Curated annotation (Swiss-Prot):
Family according to the record: Belongs to the Rieske iron-sulfur protein family.
SUPFAM superfamilies in UniProt: ISP domain
Protein known as: Cytochrome bc1 complex Rieske iron-sulfur subunit
Function noted in UniProt: Iron-sulfur subunit of the cytochrome bc1 complex, an essential component of the respiratory electron transport chain required for ATP synthesis. The bc1 complex catalyzes the oxidation of menaquinol and the reduction of cytochrome c in the respiratory chain. The bc1 complex operates through a Q-cycle mechanism that couples electron transfer to generation of the proton gradient that drives ATP synthesis.
InterPro entries in alphabetical order: QcrA_N, Rieske_2Fe-2S, Rieske_2Fe-2S_sf, Rieske_Fe-S_prot
Domain of life: Bacteria
Length: 429
């Protein structure tokens, strides 16, 4: 090949005095120590081959041409293992494979834990409660260890097998052309061949197992919540089993069941909940109450402790019991069809915001406004908890209440609409 042909494909002439090994490792480029004339010739754009010549070029010729077109000078390039098949190389290969396989093991563990580990809430009773409490930490632990193991394997592979290379590129502007795309592909192909991944079957298999198990576990964990049937009837009620979204702790389990409005004491010395009387709350005041039944007990037995914990943990259970001042009763506007839901001055509204289910737990006594601190929705307790500000579009669900023969406040039935934010199947507005 002539000197002109060398310039056409960007292959520099052989430098005298260097061995074949040096010639393979060092590809000369523009040398700043040369004279201005030599530097100008070195940085000049090489003559581009036509389409026929471009199609006939080998990958190495395209690689050299791509570097010259991009102003890239390879200052140093050396394979990690000049001699193939040594014991040290095989040890390095096995260490990478171990990390990739560990990623697969942890990914498979994530999948199995997500599918078979007890995930439903269990009241505190020692071993079963401890197993349930590990669910979320195990999700995070197996997911994190899987991706960490794969990342360590990838880093080790780069450090131990990808050829060590130092390249210097001049900064330049310009849009990509067909010749640039072809030479980039040549560079990528050279990088793939130089990585020696093609002949490392153990690492390739380990990487496939690791990424496959990790991807499958992650996909199942992500899609698991999307394929759950929310309408499966699992909650026993007086009207038969219903789906969770249609029920709350205030839903009677049988006809005529008495459900008390109970205050949480927050102490361990006495019972966790005590029944409320009208005189227990001042005019204009608000109290958070929970559904309590006589069968729930006082927490002195294991069964009672379980039931009371379920009351406290139930997301639809908290209710705001508000006592309107006698002077403000004339300003009260009741919702159509719910005129009998209050007991005199006492009104009970769910504490679950109708926007996104946040706890609307702030109450302004002077204006009777209920505030959700998460997204700033405000509800007017004098106007059947109708939203007056913020993103909430529906009134808070109202619980019908009355008083029993012993003077305790009790629920006079269940909520007549689902508690909390909207979903497609609800018909109430």
């Amino acid at each position: 090949m002539s000197r002109a042909d060398d310039d056409a494909v960007g292959v520099p002439p052989t430098c005298g005095g260097r061995s074949d090994e040096e010639e393979r490792r060092i590809v000369p480029g523009p040398n700043p120590q040369d004279g201005a004339k030599d530097g100008a010739k070195a940085t000049a754009v090489p003559r581009e081959p036509d389409e026929a010549a471009l199609a006939a070029m080998s990958n190495q010729e395209l690689l050299a041409l791509g570097g010259k077109l991009d102003g890239v000078r390879i200052a140093y390039k050396e394979p990690r293992w000049p001699v193939e098949g040594t014991k040290a190389e095989k040890r390095a290969e096995r260490s990478v494979a171990v990390w990739l396989l560990l990623g697969g093991v942890f990914g498979l563990a994530l999948l199995l834990i997500f599918l078979f580990w007890p995930w439903e809430f269990k009241a505190a009773d020692g071993e079963s409660d401890f197993i349930y409490s590990l669910t979320t930490p195990l999700y995070g632990l197996t997911f994190g260890l899987s991706i960490l193991s794969i990342a360590i394997g990838a880093v080790l592979y780069q450090k131990r097998f990808i050829p060590e290379e130092i390249s210097i590129q001049e900064r330049h502007d310009g849009a990509s052309r067909e010749i640039d795309r072809k030479t980039v592909v040549a560079n990528l192909t050279d990088a793939f061949e130089g990585s020696t991944i093609r002949r490392r079957k153990l690492i390739g298999l380990s990487f496939g197992v690791g990424m496959g198990a990790f991807g499958l576990g992650t996909l199942v964990a992500f899609a698991g919540g999307l394929i759950k049937n929310p309408w499966k009837p699992v909650v026993p009620t007086a009207e038969g089993k219903k789906a969770v979204l249609w029920t709350s702790g205030w839903t009677p389990r049988y006809q005529g069941e008495t459900i008390y409005l109970a205050r949480a004491t927050g102490t361990e010395d006495g019972p966790p909940f005590i029944k409320m009387r009208p005189e227990d709350i001042d005019a204009g005041g608000m109290e958070t109450v929970f559904p309590w039944r006589e069968s729930d007990g006082d927490g002195t037995t294991v069964e009672s402790h379980h039931k009371l914990q379920e009351i406290a943990m139930g997301i639809r259970n908290p209710v705001m019991l508000i006592r309107i001042k006698p002077s403000d009763l004339g300003r009260v506007v009741k919702r159509k069809g719910q005129e009998s839901f209050n007991f005199g001055e006492f009104f009970a509204f769910t504490k679950v915001c109708s926007h996104l289910g946040c706890p609307s737990s702030l109450y302004e006594q002077q204006s009777y406004r209920i505030l959700c601190p998460c997204h700033q929705s405000q509800f007017d307790a004098l106007h059947f908890a109708k939203p007056i500000f913020g993103p909430a579009a529906r009134a808070l669900a109202q619980l019908p209440i009355t008083i029993d023969t012993d003077g305790y406040l009790v629920a006079n039935g269940d909520f007549v609409e689902p508690v909390g934010p909207a979903f497609w199947e609800r018909t109430t507005t």
